[in-house]
Amino acid sequence: MKLKFSKMHGLGNDFVVLDGVRQSVSLSPEQLCYLADRHFGVGCDQILLVEKASQPGIDFRYRIFNADGGEVEQCGNGARCFVRFVHDEGLTDKREIRVETMRGIISPRLEGDGNVTVDMGIPRFLPAEIPFLAEDDVIIHLLDVADETLETSVVSMGNPHAVQVVDSVDTAPVGEHGPLIEKHPRFPLRVNAGFMQIVDRHAIKLRVYERGSGETMACGTGACAAVVAGIRRGLLDSPVRVTTRGGDLTIAWGGDERPVLMTGPAVTVFTGEIEL
């Protein structure tokens, strides 16, 4: 079958976006892996699928698949690309839309300057909500990795994150520790591993080793999780500029039981059609 797609990115975190509203899209894990393959397919970190909403009062359904073919709960950079895509494709003329994801409703908004702000929902910290194997809900957990004990904050932004503070993201052992943290036995569903350098109380640098994709140029939910973790630890104040390898995001959080707001760009690189 022939499938139309758009190639997009948010700060270098790149996506193949599929319109499941105007074309039938039902792909096997093998086909998803083929699409994501940078040598034989289109190439991307994740595949985003736009579908009709399954409930009233919601505009669209948003599904996310990693490069390994597995479906995941949430992707912040993808959410920005999602709202840009549905506007550019004429699927809606609303500046703010309500979108259902695997883990709840999000409300991305297209700003006048072309950036997109996404209400990423309320962060969760209880170990059972991550999920993370621990008895207590504490701000810092000790995680044994590669003969080291790491001070780690665990946060769910609809998907699981483990965040640690490092002296420098340039020398952080992302390639070594990232996959070990991702598959650590205390995270039953695996985890995204964040490495955060504090610049000042309103700025950080961040690298993220993403679950199922490896290190990416940027991770929206990872940026949210890092800022939330830093604020809870008393290291940061909202709003925070997050500098990733792909560019900058602005993250704002008002505290417990309040949603995290993420603002940043979304870019269409090209459109095309592929035979599957």
Curated annotation (Swiss-Prot):
Reactions catalysed, as given in the entry: (2S,6S)-2,6-diaminopimelate = meso-2,6-diaminopimelate
Active site, UniProt feature: C75 (proton donor), C219 (proton acceptor)
InterPro entries given in the database record: DAP_epimerase_AS (IPR018510), DAP_epimerase_DapF (IPR001653)
Location within or outside the cell: Cytoplasm
UniProt enzyme class: isomerase
Annotated GO CC locations: cytosol
Site feature: Could be important to modulate the pK values of the two catalytic cysteine residues: H161, E210
Pathway recorded for this protein: Amino-acid biosynthesis; L-lysine biosynthesis via DAP pathway; DL-2,6-diaminopimelate from LL-2,6-diaminopimelate: step 1/1
Family: Belongs to the diaminopimelate epimerase family.
HAMAP family attached to this UniProt entry: DAP_epimerase
Name of protein: Diaminopimelate epimerase
Gene of this entry: dapF
